Amino acid sequence: SEADLNHPMLRDVVPMAPKRTLVTGCDGQLGHAVRRLAEERGVAKDFDFCDIDTFDMSVPDAYAQYDGSLYGTVINCGAYTAVDKAETSEGRAAAWKANATGPALLARTCSEHGITLVHVSSDYVFDGTAEVHDEDEPFSPLSVYGQTKAAGDIAVAGCPRHYIMRSSWVIGEGRNFVKTMRGLSDRVAAPDDKLDKITVVDDQLGRLTFTRDMAEAIFHVLDAKAPYGT
C-alpha cells in the first residue's frame, strides 16, 4: 500500500524476489513447448532454461552454478530417449546416467531446498499389456530405456514436493517421428542417396502426447497446487 511504501521503517526495505523456475532439457521438444508457453504467459522472465550443454544434471559438481534458495520449481524435461540405442553397451550407460542418476540428483537437491520437482516420465515403465495404465500400476519395464525411466521415477518419488507426469508418443517442435519419417522418405526418393527402403515397426499401439498439451498440464498442476504425486 501507499502507507507501507512511505513508512519510515519500510522505506528502504527491498521486496523479496519471487522464486524462480528452472527448466532442464530446454532444447528438446517438450522444453521448447514449456519455454513458448512461459513466454506467452509473460512469466519467462522468472524462468531459467538450460540444456545438457550448460547444465548436466547427472554430474554432482554441476549444481554449484545454481543457488538453490532462489528456486521454487524445477521442471525436468531432459532425458535420454534413444530407446533402441539404450540396448547397446554405450547407450545403456548414457541412459542410466541421464534418466536415473540425473533425476536422483535433482530430487536430492530439490528436497534439500524445499523445491517442487516436476518430472516427465514415460509409458515405457510399463510392459504395455494393460489397455489403460493408471497411477498405481506397478512398474514392469521391458527395455533398458524403460528400466532407467522407472529408476528415475523411484528417485523422484522420494522428493516431498514432486509431480510425475507420464508421456507416450511425444510430438512437438524439434526431432519427432513424423519429421524423421519425412526425412527418410526424402532420402529414399533421392536418386543419389543409397537408402532404398524404410523399415518401421507395425505392431505397436500408442497415444500421441502433444508437447503443447503436456506443457499446459504442467502449468495447470503447478497453478492449481494439486496434491503432490504421480
Segments from the language model and where they lie:
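Rossmann-fold cofactor-recognition segment
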Residues: 48-59
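N-terminal Rossmann NAD(P)H-binding glycine-rich loop of SDR-like oxidoreductase domains
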Residues: 18-40
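Catalytic helix-loop patch of NAD(P)-dependent Rossmann-fold dehydrogenases
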Residues: 97-105, 124-175
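Mid/C-terminal beta-alpha module of Rossmann-like enzyme folds, strongest
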Residues: 215-218, 224-230
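SDR active-site strand-loop-helix element
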Residues: 24, 50, 74-78, 117-123, ...
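NAD(P)-dependent short-chain dehydrogenase/reductase
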Residues: 154-220
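NAD(P)H-binding glycine-rich loop region in Rossmannoid oxidoreductase-like domains
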Residues: 57-98, 111
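Short linear sequence motif anchored by a di-proline
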Residues: 1-15
